[in-house]
Amino acid sequence: MTYKPSPRPSYSMPTHIEYNNMKIHKWGDEEAGYVDDWIYISNEKLHQIIFGLKPHSCFKHSKEFRTIFGADELLYILSGIFVISNPETGETHKVLPGDSIFFRKDTWHHGFNVSDEYLQVLEFLSPPPSLGSSGFYAKTKPYI
């Protein structure tokens, strides 16, 4: 599958965003793994999603879907047990529901759901993809 940018929902006024009416964006390919993304807002100021992984599944990276961004990330675990690992350095953290992890731009990361339940993670990315911080930025970095 070829990389294509995710949807960029944006709102000019207070808006009720209903979870049940959201479309799921699928990120990934066979090599990288697949992630479900519920994109709440992604404009020039803010990118906020919930991403999900099936029990005992993971995401890594592939040539098309790289996991290094020109943005800082804050991840808050809603459900499941998340293990995040930097394939470049080997640094690894186990993150439980109610806990968060933060990392700076240019940090490679792989994610693993090591639980029997569906993993959901609240993610904030800054600067947002609309300013060029995600997929196309990742392709400017050396591939590991």
Put a short name on every predicted segment.
Residues 51, 87-89, 114, 124:
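Surface loops and adjacent helix of pleckstrin homology
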Residues 35-36, 58-64:
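A short, acidic/glycine-rich surface segment
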Residues 1-52, 139-144:
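A short, N-terminal "cap"/entry segment at the start of jelly-roll beta-barrel domains
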Residues 44-46, 54-59, 81, 130-131:
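Short, charged/polar surface micro-motifs in flexible loops or helix N-caps
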